[in-house]
Amino acid sequence: MAELSTRYNLPANVTENSINLDLNSTARWIKEPSVGGWTVKWGNFVFHIPNTGMTLLHHLKSNFVVPEWQQTRNLFSHLFKNPKSTIIEPFLALRILLGVALKDQELQQSLIPGFRSIVHMLSEWLLLEVTSAIHISPNLLGIYLTSDMFKILMAGVKNFFNKMFTLHVVNDHGKPSSIEIKLTGQQIIITRVNMGFLVEVRRIDIEPCCGETVLSESVVFGLVAEAVLREHSQMEKGQPLNLTQYMNSKIAI
């Protein structure tokens, strides 16, 4: 019987995403200096991070600010008026964002147990450490982090970026401007401001007297410029959006 055959079919087009797919890239954090900032490589992402906002954050944290900035200092008093707060560099703030993006997938999606374990390890590494690599057993990577799972993971990070771009800049219209997540021992708040995204991490302590959880005064925070994430986001492709998503002259950052 004559049978259908694909003997002489042309090779399928190879997309950019399938070239040099390195599953181990999720376990490496490569940071290199660049003109005016840094280049960070993680997963299949390459982020170009300018040293934007650092000087302004330090000015806001000082006592020598113009009157127009006082409202911003008052709104974020736990950051700018708190002697126990620490400003971190933009690439560390980005690292926290990526950790939260992975944690968001871990908490919200029905992942198979082995894959969930890898996502958990990666998110904890990004959130709690500053090392350039994490060792994950090659057997685990080979079994649970397949190329398809890798693509799902990266797509989930992009979806989280898209969610961030639905936020409005801090405003007085009651429109949502922050994403908050509570993890074991810490609370992370991501807030959209004029310059990008303000990332803050506050430790959660337990009161010895009553066992209740309270937010510690100790907090680290940093700023990720909007352009860093926009090139990896699928939002705002020409459609008009509410202007409160873009600018609020009442805040300094």
UniProtKB/Swiss-Prot annotation:
The keyword Membrane applies. GO terms for biological process: viral process. InterPro entries: Filo_VP24 (IPR009433). This is Membrane-associated protein VP24. Belongs to the filoviridae membrane-associated protein VP24 family. It comes from Lake Victoria marburgvirus (strain Musoke-80) (MARV). Monomer or homotetramer (Potential). Interacts with nucleoprotein. It is found in: Virion membrane; Host cell membrane; Host endomembrane system. It comes from the Viruses. It is a peripheral membrane protein. One of its GO terms (molecular function) is structural constituent of virion. GO terms for cellular component: host cell endomembrane system; host cell plasma membrane; membrane; viral nucleocapsid; virion membrane. May act as a minor matrix protein that plays a role in assembly of viral nucleocapsid and virion budding. Unlike Ebola VP24, mVP24 has no measurable impact of host dendritic cell function. Keywords: Host cell membrane, Host membrane, Membrane, Viral matrix protein, Virion.
